[in-house]
Amino acid sequence: MTDRKFFIFLLFCFSILFISLFYKSFNSPILYFPDYNQLNYFINLDDIDQYLYDDESFDCTEFSNLFVKRFADKGFFSCTAELNLLSNNKSFGHIIVAVYTLDKGLFYVEPQTDMIISDKDLILNTNYCNLVSWSCNWTIKKVSSCFGVSY
């Protein structure tokens, strides 16, 4: 192979590599951590809390997954968080959303009510219902999300 053909071959290979990297960088979403105002702004505009809860087709998991998807569509990272709760000596789970804000740290969102809960308030052995203004008694036994686990 002559030097000229080799140079053209290398140029072709690098062009393909560059185009594939360039294409990938613009077609893979990059998600950012929001600040608290961006989180609050999103919650005020979004209508997820207006959906009707249904045990069979739209429960806490669907509320939370829809929040995470729509928040990502706006360019922000969040993840679901599982709460292990206790009520009347029965254990059960509940799914909410965890969001790390750049300026104020970790928060949790109850997407059914749009309540924003500080990680300092979502502590073990407290009544979750008091945090979201529901009339029930669900004692928090564990909080698990992509940001960490509390037992």
Tell what function each PLM region has.
Residues 3-151:
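A structural boundary/capping signal
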